[in-house]
Amino acid sequence: MQYGTFVISLDFELLWGVRDKRTVADYGANIRGVRDVVPALLDLFAERDIACTWATVGLLFAGTEEAMVAALPARKPDYANPRISSYHYLAEVGADEERDPYYYGLSLIRRILGYPAQEIGTHTFSHFYCLEEGGSTDAFRADLEAARVAAAHLGVSLASIVFPRNQISPVHLAVSREFGLRAFRGNEQTWFHRARRDREQNLLVRGCRLADSYLPLAGAHDREPALVGGLVDVPASRFLRPVSRNAALERLRLWRITSAMETAARRRRLFHLWWHPHNFGVDLQENLAFLRKILDHFRILQDRYGMRSMTMAAVADEVLNAHGQSGTAHQ
């Protein structure tokens, strides 16, 4: 890469992304808070000229229950554990977005589309789990078709995919390519970040990931995008955790991120920051203040090294063009 690149991707999912583990009772405040998070992030990104990929669950494109039901794929996953399926919770969904802020996102998607340098990608239609037992290839293909159609209703042509729970496999990359997807967010290379089933997410794995937010267990996290199975891997560098009350840990967390960004800018490589809007759903102002510090450092790196802010699709198109293949995104 000629210059270092800063990528932000957001897993935009509302309750669909956590319903197998959380409820409205214990996590509803975070989900409701997304109604304020999305406009606040968009304004901040516009103010700082920051590009972002919003990897959006396809079910969020519906504005009413009727529209949601009409958009469902005929073939659905038959998970061994039915509680991980979004379709298991359809009976909970309210009549429309005004009455149900947990499962609908149409107005927020429209708002995103009104801002510059913001890409709508896919987080699959149903928050599909590619590595869980019962998530067949045919069901995944039907899921992506439903996501494609839902996005097309708003004039969106999907170019990027973020796999739910980062469950990636070569087979699912091949199916993604069938639908014209060009970019995916690959996992970090260390063992505790590799793709795995939910039951394999043990305390050791989770503990190492948490510790890596503060200590350099997995190195600098600067990578180069690469062609993998015909798609461009725009690899993850760092999950942006919500703020904590421990000021010393927060300083360490900020240093961990900004030092890795500095390394990427200096080496002309990529730094990819990601999180979920609902991570900012409570303590919004504190989380925005932390993000502003990151963006302040990006501006320094932009001036010093020419570091760029790009969407996943734009990175993919640059890589594909370098390999003599065409791309169409320009963010």
Question: Where in this protein do the model-derived segments appear?
Answer:
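Catalytic alpha-helical scaffold of carbohydrate-active enzymes acting on polysaccharides/glycoconjugates
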Residues: M1-S160, R165-V232, E250-L273, F280-Q331
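Active-site clefts of carbohydrate-active enzymes
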Residues: G230-A247, H276-H278
